[in-house]
Design a protein with these regions (language model features):
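Glycine-rich, aromatic-bearing surface loops/beta-hairpins
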Residues: 97-164
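Short loop/turn segments at secondary-structure transitions that flank enzyme active sites
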Residues: 38-40, 81, 114-117
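Short HxH-centered metal-ligating active-site micro-motif
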Residues: 57-94
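Short acidic, S/G/P-rich loop/turn micro-motifs used as interaction or catalytic elements
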Residues: 53, 80-83, 130, 137-138
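N-terminal domain-onset segments
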Residues: 1-63
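Short, surface-exposed beta-edge/turn micro-motifs
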Residues: 28-33, 70-72, 94, 103-107
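Short glycine-rich, low-complexity/disordered patches
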Residues: 25-36, 72-77, 159-164
Length: 164
């Protein structure tokens, strides 16, 4: 997967949300899309699922089965972000939502099921800043859940090919 694919899908999601939602940085549910990219064309993004709890959605076997035919999938969710400049905040367990410098953030994770590559973008509600992570840098419960979903989707894909 190329970084250009991430940029293009991030832009499509951003523009679409801005056109259709009053609060594109306060989503009521996390969203997942099946994604296909064809040379010279806009990416095809098919809504697959949404759920108010991202972890419930990512743990769903039916969602894994629904995304298995696609070469990629994208996850979009919103929440709070806080600067990591003060290590004591992290050590004290201060959640980003309570940090005095908190910001609304929308995260897009793009997963290539053929190469196991995961890229992400972060957009902030109070600026035009975009941070692109072209390497698999994430860690923690969200990354673990995304990797688990990818593994389960691959099992569904193998099972379907075996039965064809």
């Amino acid at each position: 997967m190329k970084a250009d694919t991430l940029y293009q899908i991030d832009r499509e999601i951003h523009e679409g949300f801005n056109l259709t939602m009053m609060k594109p940085f306060n989503l009521e549910a996390a969203h997942i899309y099946g994604v296909e990219v064809f040379p010279g064309e806009r990416p095809m993004m098919i809504p697959v699922a949404e759920h108010p709890d991202i972890y419930t959605m990512l743990d769903s076997s039916s969602v894994a089965e629904d995304i298995s035919p696609y070469s990629m999938f994208a996850i979009v969710t919103t929440g709070w972000a806080a600067p990591l400049e003060d290590v004591t905040d992290i050590e004290d367990g201060l959640p980003p939502s309570q940090h005095p410098k908190r910001r609304r953030v929308r995260v897009l994770m793009l997963v290539d099921q053929e190469t196991d590559q995961i890229m992400s973008s972060l957009r902030f509600g109070d600026s035009d800043d975009v941070i692109y992570n072209e390497e698999r840098e994430g860690a923690g419960s969200l990354m673990d859940a995304v990797e688990s979903l990818m593994r389960t989707a691959k099992k569904h894909k193998r099972g379907r090919n075996f039965n064809d």
